């Protein structure tokens, strides 16, 4: 391969350039999951406020409130993890552990938030074509591309085990 065609521009830098690219993409997936969760929360609350059961808004029922609260807390945790991974990435390092953790948590989180949103909509969420139904289907993809959840788990565990071994 000629010097002009080397990935990374310098011999020996190709892997680092490739890893930088995939880790950038994984950070982007995590951030997208956070954005999707925010949208889902912003869709579920008005529905819960407007839908009545037993002469009471769904939003006033403790079980529904718990689902809304859980969705927000998980979204906020994923946002914090993603922002920290991005901050470390922007510093020039490749924080693979933090990025895999953020991508794994955020992609699993958005599926749970989508499930909560669909649960709040009830049968209408399953039978009718609406934004939450579409997002419920679409969020499943986040656990697959740029490395499945199982690949992220493996990367996280391998990194932690290596770090522990290196300390000894």
Residue ranges and their predicted role:
Residues 44, 85, 136-140:
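Short alpha-helical scaffolding segments that buttress acidic/His motifs in well-ordered protein cores
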Residues 100-168:
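Alpha-helix capping/hinge segments and adjacent helical runs
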Residues 12, 24, 94-96, 115, ...:
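Active-site lining segments that contact anionic ligands and/or coordinate catalytic metals
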Residues 21, 60, 93-94, 98, ...:
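Residue-level "hotspot" positions that anchor or transmit function at local structural transition points
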Residues 13, 34, 54, 91, ...:
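Short glycine-rich loop/turn motifs that provide flexible caps or phosphate-binding loops at active sites
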Residues 1-76, 142, 151, 158, ...:
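Glycine-rich beta->alpha junctions and the first turn(s) of the following alpha-helix
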Residues 34, 41, 65, 79-82, ...:
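Hydrophobic face of alpha-helices
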Residues 45-59, 72-105, 118-121:
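C-terminal helix-coil-helix/basic helical segment that borders enzyme active sites and/or dimer interfaces
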